């Protein structure tokens, strides 16, 4: 079972079971440490953890990603370490359709955890498409709070996105979820999860 799915199930189960001291707050142990998850109606909100590693990707790491995703260096618009615990690195492509067409070479991607983001056309309900590829284990995660939190910090902080945007993830797996990011805050649509700074 994937760690993200396990965490989502545990948090969902905790919200429905027992009587915590404050029924609006659950504290979840994550790689980054303890994360307070606040319930607001059907939404879950949690503070975006600080980035542990930022800055441009090293040339060797970027080359590995380009090769693993079957891209060329000109396909990469921007790249960055966006590690808030799990070790995420990220690349931005020129379009959401390019992101959706990716078919990684898992053997080359190993052991990286790579987030890929690309803009949708203005008429689309989401501003960006996000995919999360985990090289160790060779799988794609359909909904990744830690990645979307760190992408929001990077994209908004670097002026690569507006201060409020919607990102879709899971589309390529027919499991689409929308994350709404405001400032360095984020909410997730069908899972109704919010992330606040």
Write out the residue ranges for each language-model feature.
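Active-site proximal loop and beta-alpha junction motif in alpha/beta enzyme cores
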Residues: 1-2, 9-197
């Amino acid at each position: 079972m994937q760690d993200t799915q396990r965490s989502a199930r545990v948090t969902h189960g905790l919200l429905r079971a027992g009587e915590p001291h404050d029924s609006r707050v659950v504290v979840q142990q994550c790689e980054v440490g303890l994360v307070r998850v606040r319930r607001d109606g059907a939404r879950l909100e949690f503070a975006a953890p600080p980035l542990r590693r930022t800055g441009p990707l090293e040339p060797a790491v970027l080359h590995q990603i380009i090769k693993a995703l079957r891209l060329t260096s000109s396909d990469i618009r921007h790249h960055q370490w966006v590690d808030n615990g799990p070790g995420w690195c990220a690349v931005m492509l020129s379009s959401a359709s390019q992101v959706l067409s990716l078919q990684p070479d898992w053997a080359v991607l190993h052991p990286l955890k790579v987030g890929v983001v690309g803009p949708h056309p203005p008429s689309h309900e989401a501003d960006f498409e996000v995919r999360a590829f985990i090289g160790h284990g060779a799988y794609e995660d359909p909904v990744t709070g830690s990645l979307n939190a760190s992408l929001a910090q990077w994209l908004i902080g670097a002026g690569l996105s507006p201060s409020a945007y919607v990102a879709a993830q899971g589309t390529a797996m027919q499991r689409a979820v929308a994350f709404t990011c405001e400032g360095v805050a984020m909410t997730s649509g069908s899972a109704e999860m919010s992330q606040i700074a």
